[in-house]
Every structure is written in structure tokens, then in C-alpha cells.
Regions:
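Gly/Thr-rich phosphate-binding beta-strand-loop-beta motif of the actin/hexokinase/Hsp70
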Residues: 1, 55-75, 250-260
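N-terminal glycine/serine-rich phosphate-binding loop of ATP-dependent small-molecule kinases
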Residues: 1-40, 172, 188-202, 222-236, ...
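Phosphate/ATP-binding catalytic cores across multiple sugar-kinase/actin-like superfamilies
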Residues: 5, 148-171
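Glycine-rich phosphate-binding/hydrolytic loop that grips phosphoryl groups
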Residues: 46, 90-95, 202-230
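Acidic, glycine/GT-rich loop-and beta-edge segments that sit at the periphery of enzyme/chaperone cores
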Residues: 67, 218-273
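Glycine-rich phosphate-binding loop plus the immediately following alpha-helix
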Residues: 73-116, 214, 218, 261-265, ...
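Adenine-nucleotide phosphate-binding core of ATP-dependent small-molecule kinases
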Residues: 130-159
Length: 273
């Protein structure tokens, strides 16, 4: 639907090459016959490196997950991911702001004006809910609660995901990415915990997509081949079918999901062997 609307609205734009990344990158690549796909970590590094070539640490906090990369000599040297749940991510903040009757944007603005941020720790959403209710009973203002939530997101990333003992040693050139960092309260909390400023690009929530686009552009400069991405006419006849089968290749009998698209394009997933 997005591609159809985009190509209809901007008929003079010609897609030279296309690439996908993130969750479902191979599904999207096969569905729309994109030329390339790129692992999400590389997409984030490529975009951060474009804006800050000397970047040595990247932290990406999205709606559902946290990804952190340590960069050494221009190479990703270590990766940290949240392993348990989405606590401490964008959805976490949205859940609590909505529960208290505010939009995430309003909550962020209030948090920046907090005088005494509440110490809510960095626990999961279930326990955090109890902490928030207790803070309300103790007379904490909404601004102080929102500030406490922003701080908890930062502490969760630093001390539970990265397991840092000294945040000031993470790096000298840090880039923060992901939609959660568009929340100025989270950004400020992160800088205060580190004791230094970090770099946030205006379109922090689109850095993965930007890095992916850079990858497609670089590849095109090498081969100059015509794109295989579906045209507007081809999109009008787009079809997608899904079925599951048990693989008979061995005794494991993996349950495979077969995604079939028009033009005999297929993506098979679920193979655990």
C-alpha cells in the first residue's frame, strides 16, 4: 500500500535500487523483489558513520528492543541486545504516558520540567506499574514520574543490557538512534548518566532505513543494473499466499512457513536444522 501510494503520488520518481532491513527484511525483499537486504546492525552503523565518521559507540532504542554496538577501528567489535522483553523501550514509555492520560510528546515535555524525578529503578513493566502507583500515593507530580520513567529507560539500557560498570567509558563519540531518543527527556537523562553530550540526528527513528538506502546506493554504483523492484503496474496485481508444511528432509520435521508471491517468488522460513 505504501509503495503504491508513493509511486502514485510521485509519478516522476524512479526507484533505482531498493534494499530492506530490520524485522522481516527477507520477507519484504522477496515480496517486492528488492535487490538487496542488509543486517540491521550494519544499517545502523552505516548511517551513524555517515554523520560521525569517528563514532565508537552506537545505542539504538526502538519501540520493542535495544541494540548497542561497540566500534573499534571502523569495525563492529561487540553487540549488546536486550534479551528478555520490551521493558525500557519506546512502547514502555508510551504505555505509561497513555495510562496517565498524556501523549508521549506531552510526557517528554513535562519530564524536562521535573524538579524531583522519582527513582523507579529499572524493573519490568509489571513491577514498574506498582512503583508508579506508589509514587502517586506518595504525592509525586506527573512530571516527576515521567522524568523517573525516562531515567529508568536509560538505566535499563546501561546497566542491564550493556551491563556497564562505568558509563563514562563507553566511548568518546557516541551516536544515539531509534525513535525513543526523539524523547528529549530520555536524551537528557542519557547525557546526564554519561556525564557528556552525545550525537542525535534529527531523524533518529529512521537511521536504520537511511543506512539501508546508503547500502543500495553504494551497490548501484558498482553494477548499474536496472532495478527489479515491482513497478506500479506490477503492484496492482500483487498477491501473497501463506501456508505451512512439515519438512520431510529429515526426522526433525521442521514446520516451515512458505510465503508465495506473484511471479513465482517464494520465501521459506522455519527451518531449524
Amino acid at each position: 500500500e505504501f509503495l503504491t501510494n508513493f509511486l502514485t503520488t510521485y509519478p516522476d520518481i524512479h526507484i533505482v535500487k531498493a534494499s530492506s532491513t530490520g524485522y522481516g527484511e527477507l520477507l519484504v525483499k522477496n515480496a517486492f523483489d528488492f535487490e538487496y537486504s542488509l543486517v540491521e546492525t550494519m544499517a545502523h552503523y552505516k548511517s551513524a558513520h555517515t554523520f560521525l565518521p569517528e563514532v565508537d559507540f552506537i545505542i539504538d532504542i526502538g519501540g520493542q528492543d535495544i541494540k548497542c554496538f561497540k566500534i573499534e577501528d571502523g569495525v563492529i567489535d561487540d553487540i549488546f541486545l536486550n534479551e528478555a522483553c520490551s521493558s525500557g523501550c519506546g512502547s514502555f514509555l508510551q504505555t505509561f504516558s497513555n495510562a496517565l492520560g498524556y501523549s508521549p510528546e506531552e510526557a517528554a515535555e513535562l519530564a524536562l520540567k521535573a524538579q524531583n524525578p522519582v527513582d523507579l529503578g529499572s524493573r519490568c513493566t509489571v513491577f514498574m506499574n506498582s512503583s508508579v502507583k506508589q509514587a502517586q500515593k506518595d504525592g509525586a507530580s506527573v512530571a516527576d514520574i515521567f522524568a523517573g520513567l525516562a531515567i529508568s529507560v536509560v538505566k535499563n539500557a546501561l546497566y542491564k543490557v550493556i551491563r556497564s560498570t562505568d558509563p563514562s567509558l563507553l566511548g568518546r563519540h557516541i551516536v544515539v538512534q531509534g525513535g525513543t531518543f526523539l524523547n528529549d527527556a530520555v536524551l537528557r537523562s542519557f547525557e546526564m548518566e554519561l556525564g557528556s553530550e552525545v550525537i542525535r540526528i534529527d531523524e533518529a527513528g529512521l537511521m536504520g532505513a537511511y543506512g539501508c538506502a546508503l547500502h543500495a546506493m553504494e551497490q548501484h554504483k558498482r553494477d548499474h543494473k536496472s532495478t527489479t523492484t515491482l513497478s506500479l503496474a506490477q503492484l496492482s496485481s500483487f498477491s501473497h499466499r501463506t501456508r505451512t508444511v512439515h519438512c520431510k528432509g529429515c526426522t526433525n520435521a521442521c514446520l516451515l512457513t512458505i510465503n508465495s508471491f506473484d511471479g513465482d517468488r517464494k520465501l521459506i522460513s522455519g527451518n531449524k536444522c
